[in-house]
């Protein structure tokens, strides 16, 4: 696998970019998660960043990448509506793993947004998408720009939802390389990694949550529900960060 030219790839149409990365992805599929991280750090350009929602399995990718690249900026987009347990989990993992946490927020406070737009999450798909654009997408775009990111690590897994089922290890999103080291992990592999390294699930895991985002758009799992139905009232799975 040769060193990839980000600028040249960004000049290509999306379909051609996918084709240009196909051979590299075929090789990365054969590597384990640690090998993928090491390959990316050796072959892809910096600056490097890692994003995390500090959700149910967040400790895995935070530990995996941070142990190889200590002090890598960890981007959190904070909506102001996270669960209290999530904020506590953020503090706990930041201290335990000595994370270089970078918190980004919308330019408008949560209260100001409600005054201007009402409760966007109660306004159907269009409202949810506007909410996500304001609170997730714009802050992430700003983070990538301010941190001069060229390679972005994230902890997505194909098993999590249909929208992630066919994601490759390596892609280009928002003009930067995006690397998904644990994309092919199942729940058992996640559990084993957490156990091996003395790490915990998000505190709400024990209360029946399979996925955790904002308080107003997250539901406990109930028998018969798919994991993606626990977020955004089942109207959509992605918050916008990992789309486009």
Curated annotation (Swiss-Prot):
Catalytic machinery residues: 239 (nucleophile)
Keywords: Cytoplasm, Oxidoreductase
Biological process per Gene Ontology, one example term: sulfate assimilation, phosphoadenylyl sulfate reduction by phosphoadenylyl-sulfate reductase (thioredoxin)
Catalysed conversion reaction: [thioredoxin]-disulfide + sulfite + adenosine 3',5'-bisphosphate + 2 H(+) = [thioredoxin]-dithiol + 3'-phosphoadenylyl sulfate
Annotated GO CC locations: cytoplasm
Enzyme class of the recorded protein, top EC level: oxidoreductase
Coiled-coil intervals: none
InterPro entries linked to this entry: PAPS/APS_Rdtase, PAPS_reduct_dom, PAPS_reductase_CysH, Rossmann-like_a/b/a_fold
CDD domains reported in the protein's UniProt record: PAPS_reductase (cd23945)
Keyword Oxidoreductase set for record: yes
EC code(s) of this entry: 1.8.4.8
Cell location: Cytoplasm
One Pfam family from the record: PAPS_reduct
Listed pathway(s): Sulfur metabolism; hydrogen sulfide biosynthesis; sulfite from sulfate: step 3/3
tRNA processing as UniProt keyword: no
GO terms of molecular function: phosphoadenylyl-sulfate reductase (thioredoxin) activity
NCBIfam families in UniProt: cysH (TIGR00434), PAPS_reductase (TIGR02057), PRK02090.1 (NF002537)
PANTHER family with a match to the protein in the record: PHOSPHOADENOSINE PHOSPHOSULFATE REDUCTASE (PTHR46509:SF1)
Function: Catalyzes the formation of sulfite from phosphoadenosine 5'-phosphosulfate (PAPS) using thioredoxin as an electron donor.
Designated name of the protein: Phosphoadenosine 5'-phosphosulfate reductase
């Amino acid at each position: 696998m040769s060193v990839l030219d980000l600028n040249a790839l960004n000049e290509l149409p999306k379909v051609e970019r996918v084709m240009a990365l196909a051979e590299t992805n075929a090789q990365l599929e054969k590597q384990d998660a640690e090998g993928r991280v090491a390959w990316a750090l050796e072959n892809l350009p910096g600056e490097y960043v890692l994003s995390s929602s500090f959700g149910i399995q967040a400790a895995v990718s935070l530990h995996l990448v941070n142990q190889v690249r200590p002090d890598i900026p960890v981007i959190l987009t904070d909506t102001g509506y996270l669960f209290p347990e999530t904020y506590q989990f953020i503090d706990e993992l930041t201290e335990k793993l000595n994370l270089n946490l970078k918190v980004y927020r919308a330019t408008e406070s949560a209260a100001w947004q409600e005054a201007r737009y009402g409760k966007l999450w109660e306004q159907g798909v269009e409202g949810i998408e506007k909410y996500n654009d304001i609170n997730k997408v714009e802050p992430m775009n700003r983070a990538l720009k301010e941190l001069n990111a060229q390679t972005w690590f994230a902890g997505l897994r194909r098993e999590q939802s249909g929208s992630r089922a066919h994601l490759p290890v390596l892609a280009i999103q928002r003009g930067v390389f995006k690397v998904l080291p644990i994309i092919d992990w199942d729940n058992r592999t996640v559990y084993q990694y957490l156990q091996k390294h003395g790490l915990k699930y998000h505190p709400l895991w024990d209360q029946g949550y399979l996925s955790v985002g904002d308080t107003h758009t997250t539901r406990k799992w109930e028998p018969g529900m798919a994991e993606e139905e626990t977020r955004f009232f089942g109207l959509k799975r992605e918050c916008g960060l990992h789309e486009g």
